[in-house]
Each structure stands twice: as structure tokens, then as C-alpha cells.
From Swiss-Prot:
Null allele phenotype: RNAi-mediated knockdown causes a change in fatty acid composition, including an increase in saturated fatty acid 18:0 and decrease in unsaturated 18:1. In a fatty acid desaturase fat-6 mutant background, become thin, slow growing, reproductively inviable after 4 days, and accumulate very high levels of 18:0 saturated fatty acid. In a fat-6 mutant background, also drastically reduces expression of fat-7. In either a fat-5 or fat-7 mutant background, accumulates high levels of 18:0 saturated fatty acid, but less so than in the fat-6 mutant background.
A family per Pfam: zf-C4
Name of the protein: Nuclear hormone receptor family member nhr-80
Organism listed in the record: Caenorhabditis elegans
Gene giving rise to this polypeptide: nhr-80
Span of zinc fingers (NR C4-type): 30-50, 66-86
Family designation: Belongs to the nuclear hormone receptor family.
Function summary: Transcription factor. Binds to regulatory elements and regulates transcription of target genes, including acyltransferase dgat-2. As part of a lysosome-to-nucleus retrograde lipid signaling pathway, acts as a direct nuclear receptor of oleoylethanolamide (OEA) and, acting in concert with nuclear hormone receptor nhr-49, activates the transcription of genes promoting longevity and mitochondrial beta-oxidation. Required to modulate expression of delta-9 fatty acid desaturases, thereby regulating lipid metabolism; in some contexts, acting in concert with nhr-49.
Length: 504
């Protein structure tokens, strides 16, 4: 069983043993995830989050596979990673009706009939939120290491437009050892980030504006580095795609690997837009850089392909493309360094997560340049929270707060009519991005272990940064113990590294 499988099994047993809610008609718990219910959605008592999940699943005709393969995963609102397949089955088994999901209605200038008998009855029943039990509070505090936001999607678009507010929970993360933090980052699926637009943030330049400028610089640098068009057309910072259709060319994996350090350097320059970066130590900065590189390698091809408008091509950062329609076509040919078979085995799954999970959401909402910039910044900083030392995590939380506040202000300044809907869609996309990131790391570790092809040395160090940092921390602790005259024994318990008694 993999580490992730063991983690999910432990979480499942813990939640099952600690939470046994009485089955009574007077309970106001969600029948799917045991959160506070907000009403009857699709004929089943549930919370807004489960209702939104069910609506999207039915409306988009999604199908899921159980993450453990057993189809018996526990579903609880406090868990970091909820199996979507088992959650959907639980929605159906508890009475949710797919027929109740209606297609999107045109905008009609009519108000919602609030004062109906059923509405008054529902509001009276679910108006009082049931307090968390002691066990629930303990599990949330112990199990959540990332500030968690729950932007619960209301039952209808009208609710979104009228409420225009976000339900936010930010539990205090428990103190964990550095080794636990490093190793957990590769197996734990991150929660959606949790700042409040009302949270206090230090005064300064608008953070979204800063990242928009940096993103435009990034596009200009890519044209200079990788485009072969006339020199007079290379300069200029704008919000358009850095490449035109005639600029893109078939991707050669070998050539892309040779330029990998250039891409990492561009990401580091992007990251330095954050002033507080210099307050972190070297390991914290490197941890944040690792997450930023990973997020850029997932989101940049998604947005470049969206901007180019070629649905059968995935455009990489250097302007190279691979075919998304024919996995034996352009970009998937045999190369000296890597065979076409290995390309398809390790990179088609990553590509499909981009084209099937990330890009459709961008296309459905017709994501703007500003929204993409905010999405990428949110994913980088919230994803990097896990591996930053506990003493500096408040800086990450403040930055995430600033980004979300800035995005909300951007909507207001541009008179966006569907603020809550678009804001919520941005936040909900983070889950798929983090899942794709975990799979990306695991695939490349397998490539390294089985020597499928030679990865760049810097990439290998970033992939294994958690192990490197754990080793450094252990060696530092051993040296400190030896100076204090404490016996330190290695993992095999056969080599004595320190002496309890110092001989004079």
C-alpha cells in the first residue's frame, strides 16, 4: 500500500471512530458530509458545498474513480481529501435527484420569492447552526495544517449574487515537526486556501497589480527567449499571448529539458515580486520556489493553450506544442532520450489532467488575464504554505489574504455582475490544480527511480527537496546533541555518533 493509501486509511478509521452522529429526524447535519445543513437540495438534506458538488457533477456529466479502489471511503467535511466518487455515490444514496439539476437559466429580471411556506419552514429549521462537538473541534485542529477556507456555493445563482459574501474558517494549525511537514507535502491533498476579504492586511501596493505587471514581463521575456519572429516585434508588455499561431512548433522533449533552468529562473523572478520573500530563510525560499515552479508548469500551458485557441494542441512555455487529440502524433514521437511509449505512459496522464480538469473550467468561465494571474498566485502561495517553517507561515497567510482581497476589489472596480460566482469558481479550481501537482511530482519521481530518462539535476533536487531538508535537519539535530553530550544513534542502531561521557 502506498503512503497516500495508508494516510487515507488512517484518516478514514479516525473519522469513523470519532464521529457517530445520531440518526434523528431533528438533526440538521448534512447527510453526505455531516457539516451543518443549509436546507433540502435536490430533495436531500445537505450543506451548500455538497449541493454544489452534486450540481457540477451532474451538469458536467462527470465520472469519477475511487481513489482507493474500494468504493467505501469515508466522507466528512473536515477531511483534507474527499474521494469524489464515494461522495457522489453518497449523494445519490441519500436521496439527491439528478433530475433536479436544471440547465442554466437566462437572466430574467424577476426577484426570488422568499416568503413561501416551504422557504419559511426551511429557514426556521436551519437558521440555528449546530455547534461543533468536542471531538470535531479536536479533529479539525489536529488534522488541518493549512488555513482552510470554505467558500460554500449557495443553492442558486441568485443566492450568490444577493449574498456576495464568503463563509470562512481559519483554524490554527497545530505544531508539527519539520520532518513530518516535509514528507506530508507529497501525499496530502491541500485544502482550499482561507483568507477573508475583511482580514487585516498591511498597507502597500495592490498585490494583483504587481503580479499583473510581472506576468506581462514574463510574456515579453518568453518572446525574447523562444520566439523566432522579427526583432522589431519581440518587445512590448501586454496581456496577450506571447506567441502567435505561426510561432508555435512541435515540442521536442530533449530541447525542453535543456531550457528547464531558464524556466525555473523566470519563475524565481516572478516570485521575487513578493517583498516578504527576503524575510524567509534559504530553505523556506527554496520550498516556495519548488511549489511555484510546479504550479507554473501546470497553469502556464493551460492558459497559453486557452489564449492561442487551438483545442487540439497543448502549448508549452517555450512555444512547443504536443497533440492532445492524437497521442501518437506531434510531440509523441520516439526520441534518443525517451521513447514515445514512455512519453505516453508518464506524460499523457499529466496532460489529460490539464486538458480535462483545469482548462475546461477556464473556458467555461472565459477566464480573464487578471483572473488567471490571481489564480496562479493563489495556487503558488497556498500550495507553498505546507513546507514553510511555522514561524513564517503568517506571511503566507497574509499574502493569500491580500491576493483574494485584491481580486475582489478588481471585480468591484470593473462592475462585474457575477462577483461571487466567478470568485468561487477561481477558488474551487485550486483543488484540481493541487491534485494534478501531486500526480506530477509522483510521476517524475517514478521517472527518476526507474531511469526512464535523464531529468535535469536541479529538477531532481527540487523533486527531492523534502528529503534533502529532512536530512539537513536531522544532521543539525545530531550535531547539537553531540555538543550537549547526548548519545545519538543512526537509523540502523549500530553506529554510535556521540558519547554521553566526554573523556578528559
Amino acid at each position: 500500500m502506498t503512503a497516500e493509501g495508508r494516510y487515507l486509511e488512517i484518516r478514514k478509521k479516525t473519522v469513523k471512530s470519532k464521529f457517530r452522529f445520531p440518526a434523528s429526524s431533528s438533526s440538521t447535519r448534512c447527510l453526505i458530509c455531516s457539516a451543518q445543513a443549509t436546507g433540502f437540495h435536490f430533495e436531500a438534506q445537505s450543506c451548500s458545498a455538497c449541493a454544489a458538488f452534486f450540481r457540477r457533477t451532474v451538469a458536467l456529466t462527470k465520472s469519477f474513480k475511487c481513489i482507493t479502489g474500494r468504493d467505501d471511503c469515508n466522507v466528512h467535511y473536515s477531511m483534507h481529501q474527499i474521494c469524489r466518487s464515494c461522495r457522489h455515490k453518497k449523494c445519490l444514496s441519500n436521496g439527491m435527484k439528478p433530475g433536479g439539476v436544471q440547465p442554466k437559466k437566462p437572466n430574467i429580471e424577476t426577484g426570488r420569492a422568499f416568503f413561501t411556506k416551504s422557504g419559511l419552514k426551511r429557514n426556521k429549521k436551519f437558521a440555528n447552526v449546530s455547534p461543533q462537538t468536542a471531538d470535531e473541534q479536536k479533529l479539525v485542529v489536529e488534522g488541518v495544517k493549512v488555513p482552510k477556507i470554505e467558500v460554500q456555493e449557495p443553492n442558486s445563482l441568485e443566492d450568490l449574487e444577493q449574498d456576495n459574501e464568503f463563509v470562512i474558517k481559519t483554524p490554527t494549525p497545530r505544531k508539527i515537526s519539520s520532518s513530518t511537514s516535509f514528507s506530508a507535502s507529497t501525499t496530502t491533498n491541500y485544502s482550499t486556501p482561507g483568507p477573508s476579504p475583511m482580514a487585516p492586511c498591511s498597507a502597500g501596493p495592490d498585490v494583483l497589480t504587481l503580479f499583473i505587471r510581472e506576468e506581462m514581463k514574463l510574456g515579453e521575456r518568453r518572446r525574447l527567449l523562444f520566439s523566432e519572429r522579427a526583432v522589431g516585434t519581440l518587445l512590448g508588455q501586454n496581456k496577450h499571448c506571447p506567441y502567435k499561431k505561426e510561432d508555435i512548433k512541435p515540442l521536442v522533449f530533449h530541447d525542453f529539458r535543456l531550457t528547464i533552468k531558464t524556466h525555473i529562473m523566470l519563475v524565481y523572478e516572478w516570485l521575487q515580486t513578493w517583498p516578504e520573500l527576503q524575510e524567509l530563510d534559504d530553505f523556506d525560499r527554496m520550498s516556495l520556489l519548488r511549489k511555484a515552479v510546479l504550479i507554473h508548469f501546470l497553469l502556464d500551458p493551460s492558459f497559453l493553450s486557452y489564449q492561442i485557441g487551438e483545442p487540439d494542441k497543448l502549448i508549452m512555455q517555450n512555444g512547443g506544442f504536443i497533440s492532445t487529440a492524437d497521442h501518437h502524433g506531434v510531440g509523441w514521437e520516439d526520441e534518443t532520450d525517451i521513447s514515445g511509449e514512455n512519453k505516453r505512459k508518464y506524460y499523457v496522464p499529466i496532460m489529460k489532467q490539464i486538458t480535462d480538469e483545469i482548462m475546461p473550467a477556464m473556458e467555461a468561465m472565459k477566464i480573464t488575464f487578471e483572473e488567471f494571474v490571481a489564480l496562479k498566485a493563489l495556487a503558488c502561495f497556498q500550495g507553498g504554505f505546507e513546507n514553510v517553517s511555522e514561524a513564517k507561515r503568517h506571511l503566507i497567510t497574509q499574502q493569500v489574504n491580500r491576493i483574494m482581497t485584491s481580486l475582489h476589489t478588481h471585480y468591484l472596480e470593473n462592475s462585474e455582475e457575477k462577483i461571487a460566482e466567478r470568485f468561487g469558481t477561481i477558488v474551487l479550481m485550486l483543488s484540481n490544480i493541487f491534485t494534478a501537482g501531486n500526480d506530477f511530482v509522483q510521476n517524475h519521481r517514478e521517472i527518476d527511480i526507474f531511469h526512464i530518462w535523464d531529468l535535469d539535476k536541479l529538477v531532481l533536487q527540487l523533486l527531492n527537496l523534502d528529503k534533502i531538508m529532512e536530512t539537513e535537519a536531522r544532521e543539525t539535530a545530531e550535531k547539537r546533541a553531540m555538543r550537549n553530550g547526548i548519545n545519538v544513534v543512526n537509523n540502523n542502531n549500530d553506529v554510535l555518533l556521540g558519547q554521553a561521557k566526554l573523556e578528559k
